[in-house]
Amino acid sequence: MERIKELRDLMSQSRTREILTKTTVDHMAIIKKYTSGRQEKNPALRMKWMMAMKYPITADKRIIEMIPERNEQGQTLWSKTNDAGSDRVMVSPLAVTWWNRNGPTTSAVYYPKVYKTYFEKVERLKHGTFGPVHFRNQIKIRRRVDINPGHADLNAKEAQDVIMEVVFPNEVGARILTSESQLTITKEKKEELQDCKIAPLMVAYMLERELVRKTRFLPVAGGTSSVYIEVLHLTQGTCWEQMYTPGGEVRNDDVIQSMIIAARNIVRRATVSADPLASLLEMCHSTQIGGIRMVDILRQNPTEEQAVDICKAAMGLRISSSFSFGGFTFKRTSGTSVKKEEEVLTGNLQTLKIRVHEGYEEFTMVGRRATAILRKATRRLIQLIVSGRDEQSIAEAIIVAMVFSQEDCMIKAVRGDLNFVNRANQRLNPMHQLLRHFQKDAKVLFQNWGIEPIDNVMGMIGILPDMTPSTEMSLRGVRVSKMGVDEYSSTERVVVSIDRFLRVRDQRGNVLLSPEEVSETQGTEKLAITYSSSMMWEINGPESVLVNTYQWIIRNWETVKIQWSQDPTMLYNKMEFEPFQSLVPKAARGQYSGFVRTLFQQMRDVLGTFDTVQIIKLLPFAAAPPEQSRMQFSSLTVNVRGSGMRILVRGNSPVFNYNKATKRLTVLGKDAGALTEDPDEGTAGVESAVLRGFLILGKEDKRYGPALSINELSNLAKGEKANVLIGQGDVVLVMKRKRDSSILTDSQTATKRIRMAIN
């Protein structure tokens, strides 16, 4: 009522009436703008106006018990009036000050734990170094980048389950924590945050930052790893850049970097094996990066890189639909084409069979150091707009586009024969033959391409055959632009198929990736990569192959020993002996193998000459296809440390040294493990392999309990029967002999009996 009276008084003054009647507020759009919807239209003004009131804040009723009515200065902190339309009370900003100074405190120990990502960011900035500011045109291109450093790689659903389990363990709702990383993180965080008083919602938000990769599509001119992205606003503007070195690395960037290196190594190695796809899968499944299984990382990490995508395709994961050629990612933005096989003649009159794309198409090409827009028709480049960091990068992009265009003048520019091969010594396909040829030398290509006069277009200049800029002339159809071409922003993934030679195709049969596209760049990984597969032993050179081969034999000696006596051929064919062959001089491989196999056969035939150490030492040499010759050797040569080193057939050498006292083997001075059994027990090895002192009674008999291992047999009493596990997981029933005299005949009969019992 009082307000209405006040208004009446105001209206009685002529000035008020004049203002309200003469000032036009009849613009409907403006009235609508400020009066419709819940969205605040002028937040700054609203804030100022609200804060000018005495009690601009509302709080829960419980606050009255927790805060005095007045502070030390006698100022009122809260009002007895309720907030209109809710059961909250009105509070003065001074109450916040009082609460901050005198309110309850919690232990500070949890802050660095909950706000971990912020504390770490401060550390990185503190130790980072900012260099000089340079003013120059920035060629920024939008790329999908990771914006929160230091996160684990869970997807949103996995993270949600972890957060619920950590922050709200008693809430109802099914939560399935399956992956190794989920379980580890949950356990870690529960321990860390016991008795934490920070608001659960805050903890949940902060956990989300720590667990989930967040990506944005941002214009970037420099480094794209998350520790650079977090300071993007400090390091690059429209016309300036500031040099910056991060003051620390974060695991998520290291994971990506190490994963790319591992994937490249694995693809390169798989290419040269007999069955590339099977080998690649075996290696991916047996490799760990920073202690986490590589396949788990591949499943969770959205990074796109040629080798990484080949590994993903092999695992049946979806990958991006763009394709790769010459190290550039191509994305078709319009047009269509059909593919036809065509035969073309090079400048050297060599015939090439190429798959020609017939039809008009437009592509974006994105590389690490250059980007381009390409418009082409059937075997004709219509236009190429390229931008890059330097002359060299621009030239790379131009070569790739010219080859991709399949123009006749490009094919005619070939001088000499095309016979490039891949790592497995197979000829490359014609398109990659052409690419390699011009990447080596593009002079003739650029000279023969032709030049044209150009119009003056803003932001574009011409480029001459010698790669110098020009404003008058340019290579036909080619222009250099100041603006970069954005990376393809979509995160869409498609189903692909992969053949045994690691060529990845989309569902229409277009090749998206092949091993030729995998970069040869070598880097040093930030996180430890552990390749358990024998195929990767050679990655660290010949010494590693030697040590790993002998370590493998010793670790698996129980099984190896049984195979040695019963099924040597199968043993010789084991892939673990493959890398070793590259150390044996080519000319000697067959002879060594024949010699060692004969020696082994004599050991099997004549009992008592068995020598564990000698078998271990010579075994890898027997894996090569043998040559029948009467050659005898007292030492065998292996190529390590840049020269041939000798392994003595009888006795120790620097390469292979067995210490009887410690029962340990050192290979080239590196420890290769210990032998569990005593090699000096005369004929121990082989006869324990064929069960010395036991009579083989026949097939497994369940009444005698579970199968024992060879080692457990020694506990049997004389005459006692047991099932025993031998060789390839076969089980036979044996009885411990009552007398020792008949031991010698066991070896001969055992082999026959085992075969009979199994078959």
Swiss-Prot record:
Superkingdom of the organism of origin: Viruses
Cellular component, GO annotation: host cell nucleus; virion component
Site positions for Avian adaptation: E627
Organism whose genome encodes this protein: Influenza A virus (strain A/Duck/Hong Kong/2986.1/2000 H5N1 genotype C)
Stated name of the protein: Polymerase basic protein 2
Regions that span the bilayer: none
Span of the annotated motif Nuclear localization signal: 736-739
Gene for this chain: PB2
Localisation per UniProt entry: Virion; Host nucleus
SUPFAM superfamilies: PB2 C-terminal domain-like
Database matches in HAMAP family: INV_PB2 (MF_04062)
Covalent S-S links between cysteines: none
GO biological process, one term: symbiont-mediated suppression of host gene expression
Purpose: Plays an essential role in transcription initiation and cap-stealing mechanism, in which cellular capped pre-mRNAs are used to generate primers for viral transcription. Recognizes and binds the 7-methylguanosine-containing cap of the target pre-RNA which is subsequently cleaved after 10-13 nucleotides by the viral protein PA. Plays a role in the initiation of the viral genome replication and modulates the activity of the ribonucleoprotein (RNP) complex.
Subunit structure: Influenza RNA polymerase is composed of three subunits: PB1, PB2 and PA. Interacts (via N-terminus) with PB1 (via C-terminus). Interacts with nucleoprotein NP (via N-terminus).
GO MF, any single term: RNA binding
Matches recorded under Pfam families: Flu_PB2_1st (PF20947), Flu_PB2_2nd (PF20948), Flu_PB2_3rd (PF20949), Flu_PB2_4th (PF20950), Flu_PB2_5th (PF00604), Flu_PB2_6th (PF20951), Flu_PB2_7th (PF20952)
